[in-house]
Design a protein with these regions (language model features):
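Extracellular attachment/recognition segments
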Residues: 2-86
Length: 86
């Protein structure tokens, strides 16, 4: 497990919410990312962007006070989407 830094960050306005899009170039299972959003997070999901082996697809993400843990079976690029209020 290691702390990740986003390669790119995009911020989009969605009315009363913002959509933060974080792109990571190489994530290993159980890596973490501290977004700094704290309890402002309202929803989140992630997509794996690498060519994955059948049976190893997908990424699971959990949130604890704005720190996200990314769990996946293979190492690869991941995009994290976070809906938040600021």
């Amino acid at each position: 497990m290691a702390a990740q830094t986003a390669a790119t960050t995009t911020r989009e306005s969605l009315g009363s919410l913002i959509l933060m899009i974080y792109t990571f170039t190489s994530v290993v299972d159980a890596d973490t990312f501290a977004s700094g959003l704290g309890s402002n997070v309202k929803g989140f999901w992630a997509n794996s962007e690498s060519a994955e082996t059948a049976g190893d697809e997908g990424v699971n993400v959990t949130n604890s006070a704005g720190t996200f843990t990314l769990n996946l079976k293979t190492t690869g690029a991941v995009t994290l989407y976070v809906l938040a209020t600021i």
